[in-house]
Amino acid sequence: MSADGGGIQDTQDKETPPEVPDRGHPHQEMPSKLGEAVPSGDTQESLHIKMEPEEPHSEGASQEDGAQGAWGWAPLSHGSKEKALFLPGGALPSPRIPVLSREGRTRDRQMAAALLTAWSQMPVTFEDVALYLSREEWGRLDHTQQNFYRDVLQKKNGLSLGFPFSRPFWAPQAHGKGEASGSSRQAGDEKEWRGACTGAVEVGQRVQTSSVAALGNVKPFRTRAGRVQWGVPQCAQEAACGRSSGPAKDSGQPAEPDRTPDAAPPDPSPTEPQEYRVPEKPNEEEKGAPESGEEGLAPDSEVGRKSYRCEQCGKGFSWHSHLVTHRRTHTGEKPYACTDCGKRFGRSSHLIQHQIIHTGEKPYTCPACRKSFSHHSTLIQHQRIHTGEKPYVCDRCAKRFTRRSDLVTHQGTHTGAKPHKCPICAKCFTQSSALVTHQRTHTGVKPYPCPECGKCFSQRSNLIAHNRTHTGEKPYHCLDCGKSFSHSSHLTAHQRTHRGVRPYACPLCGKSFSRRSNLHRHEKIHTTGPKALAMLMLGAAAAGALATPPPAPT
């Protein structure tokens, strides 16, 4: 048997047809047989596939037809500008490619399995040609062979192409991309591809390389289960024809919307990588995020756009759920309530963080001092004590702070603003926490009890300072004399004795003191006791002397 343009002309091969390996061991003999049958010299003999038409043979040649009728050799030049595309899914080595017959010849299952095994062991790439199997040929393969065929294609091409004879049921819409240089060329290309899209390429038909490049039109999409998959056109012919594969309908047939090459966007260079951005899935709090399309993938024009704007402040958001959460800052709505203390929050994440306070869990530990914290942000702020980092700077006096809240409190000293007002006594404060602490003086609430003596305090800092009376801890040390104190205020007052500072003066006699408590003790002298009575008498005498008019001169 011979073929035009470099057919196999080895008489030895005619006498000894290639053996079919055992079905249970398909990987043993087929590659060696293919290696013996494929010559390596004729690499530039033909530019397209052309097989010898079937001819009548004598009875003596029936055995030869049995061996060569199942499959034949199709020469293809290596490095030519034209490639033969049979089916998307499998790539075959060049220069000579085994092609399954389309002439209705008898197909053997074992031969198909052996052929697939040979393809899996050949160094192929997707730049070579692919092979189509007709629906009838695919049906002759058993379930194991079909799975093996898919595995081979996935390993070689890196893509899940599904069945080789029809569009995959999950294939997305692949917009047809391609431009024709002239009306005559466009008509010729359309004629060629129209025949190719029906299933198989006819023997001797030429296939343009520019259409093969349409295999690069891979589009990402998101399934209903939230998984991102990649789809490709079932064949490059469909992309060139402007046809696309849609998602499967209830009937099991893929949708085929009508598209024309004129309405398709221009095809980018096949050598340039194309990037696709899939929007991240929002968390549970952000359910109801807008999705575009049946599969939930936002179009390129919607990616990065903030189309949801607040009517009050004009702030933009990419998701509607984010806008709903933001509106609560204007309305004051707090739908998430703590079941332990009744405190309410505008976000569910804030409630979860708050509930750690009641459980007492402190999973975040400082590696330097082994101190534990209930929140990761608190640990980060604590670690700045060890590193000395102060990232927050006042824009007026350049003073630096480790916490943002401390900076906000400090900035109130420059502006004098006290936005938090007590509704009972109208006293104003720079921080809301200071207002909450102040309101306990009106309500008498003391939520911090001492576990040792049961004494209660309105502020947590007072409880911490009180606990030192039980433990005897004195963490504040004077740098001048080394004396230690349990309260920082005691250390501050003690340091004035070294510096001679006396900021507290008596308004009656002008005497100064270094501590406020000493001033209060001194003021009692002017109001009570024998000294106070003597002062009152002296004051009255002095006042009477001033009030008595002088005697008239004689």
Swiss-Prot record:
GO biological process per UniProt: negative regulation of transcription by RNA polymerase II; positive regulation of hydrogen peroxide biosynthetic process; positive regulation of mitochondrial outer membrane permeabilization involved in apoptotic signaling pathway; regulation of DNA-templated transcription; regulation of transcription by RNA polymerase II
Cellular compartments per GO CC: mitochondrion; nucleus
Q: Where is this cross-link: Glycyl lysine isopeptide (Lys-Gly) (interchain with G-Cter in SUMO2)?
A: K219
Record localization: Nucleus
State the source organism's domain of life: Eukaryota
Phosphoserine occurs at S292
SMART domains reported for this sequence:
KRAB, ZnF_C2H2
One GO term in the molecular function aspect is: zinc ion binding
Note the InterPro entries from the entry: KRAB, KRAB_dom_sf, Zinc_finger, Znf_C2H2_sf, Znf_C2H2_type
Free-text domain note: The KRAB domain is required for transcriptional repression.
PANTHER family, per the entry: C2H2-TYPE DOMAIN-CONTAINING PROTEIN, PR DOMAIN ZINC FINGER PROTEIN
Q: What is this protein called?
A: Transcriptional repressor RHIT
Q: Which organism is it from?
A: Homo sapiens (Human)
